[in-house]
Amino acid sequence: MFSTEFRYKLNNLRRILKKATVQLIRILFILASVATIVLMAYEYGYAISEAGKRYVTEGFNIIIRIFFFGSIATIFLDPKEIWQEKGYWIEIIVLALLLFVILTQTPAHFSTDNWLQKTDHILTHILLLFISIIHLSKVVVTGLQRHIRPEMTFVYSFLAIILTGAFLLMLPKAHHGSLSFIDALFTSTSAVCITGLTVVDTATTFTTTGQVVLLLLIQIGGIGVMTFTSFIALSFFTQTSFNDQMALKNILSEESMNNIFRTLFYTLFTTIIVEAIGAWILWWEIRDLSPSLIPNKIFFAIFHAVSAFCNAGFSTLTGNLYHPGIRDLYGLQCWIATLIILGGIGFPILFNYGKLVNHKVRNLFYRLTGSSKRMPSHVRIVNTTTRIVITATLLLLVGGTLLFWLSENNNCLRGLPLRGKLAVSFFSAVTPRTAGFNTVDLTSLLPSTWFLTLLLMWIGASPLSTGGGIKTTTITIALKNIINTLRGKEKIEIFKRQLPSENVRRAHAIILLSILWIGTATCLVAFWVPEGSVTQILFEVTSAISTVGLSLDFTSQLNTAGKIIISLTMFVGRVGLITLLSGLIPRQSSQSYTYAEENVIV
């Protein structure tokens, strides 16, 4: 009846319409996800009337229907894509729960005395937030698919979280009194970049709601926005291209694309487990303290466990851990220092030793049970990176502790018991390596201790950790190269392994860029904030670029220009100068020609 050409055009039109409809639904999902976050921020951030609550609830109901009927339409329009997704069964459960919410709405739905309404309210928020996170995480993969540079995707994701956090902190229910946008932006940047520098008192400025926002910003910034969103995207979507996986592989510094999802899962799992155990230990240490000192001990423990493991340095106490009644709790200081070390040592190192322990324990179990099974033998379970990090970390901790003790024994450590001197010295060697907590008055330290702290801040933590700085591996490679230059040796060999020249070039680039930024930022701050001394400004800038959070009582003196410079420095320190510049500068293709060599006098 119809010609072949007509049927072809008709089928082509149907495919185009179906594709356009599915694309429109996805756009609606993204808009609904953003609307969910906005409505939740409005409901929890403002004191709204009953009429306002009714409008908010109606808005949530509309969003529920968009997600529900949009998902149903997608299933009918493109069933293959749905059933191929890894997390399709979770989405089906969520759809069923959304249908339950829709069907259980009653005329008394807006009554605050209705238990069903309260249940619906909580369930609605949890479900909508869960779905919104899934769909917004998909945007990360979409960005990679559209050939946006992975470095810039990393940068944009941090910018988005920082701006979102700033607006959330400005909500009326998030703070007491007035809070300017620049102060909110500075605090949000400090939290997301896990720095800890503050221009306002966290304890007195922010309400519990505001401190919860800070906690979430620290957590997201600590594990990395890309880590979190990539895990969600890879969990629920299978349509990730080779380029997507290569981009994630480079961001995570993985040797194989097969390990991407496992690395993401282990990172999140390790973070949750360590922080949960740490929170319980911290609660146990403070359980007998007066409620007037710490009203909510559980929240204190959770907040400081997350802040310590993420190397953020934020505290809910005025004066940080130097607060009266807390400064003498040496057990608490040691446990917080342990969390800082675990967070700053790097996830690959934790995984490396986890693999070693698993290997040893399982082989021991097989021997004890008489089994002939054995774990496959690995030549080097503990790789070179792990050996460098562990060695450098031990040297910095032991050396830093001894030098601080020697320098401050007759100053800030005077009058303390032996265990107090040891605890304070150890903590003061740990915290400059990007944590930012303080158990002493930094302004009372001797100049020699300031410069020791400055050096520890600049070196920082280890690669792929929650800490900042130029990293322990970078300084190790640079020092090894200096030694080789003095000895006239070309090859860089560490722990019986030869390092590629790319490692050496990158290490020197990181060091040079760090010094250039510190020098430039110090000059700019000195120009705009002339009230500060050179030592204060240099200390502040180094603390910001290394995402530490220690200050010689200078942060509160910053004016608007100074806050912007330090905020930018914190941001650059978190995303990395190499990462930022690699994303901004166009890459040059390799050339097939070679110039003649000529020595230059150095």
PLM regions with names:
Residues 1-602:
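Membrane-proximal intracellular helices of multi-pass ion channels
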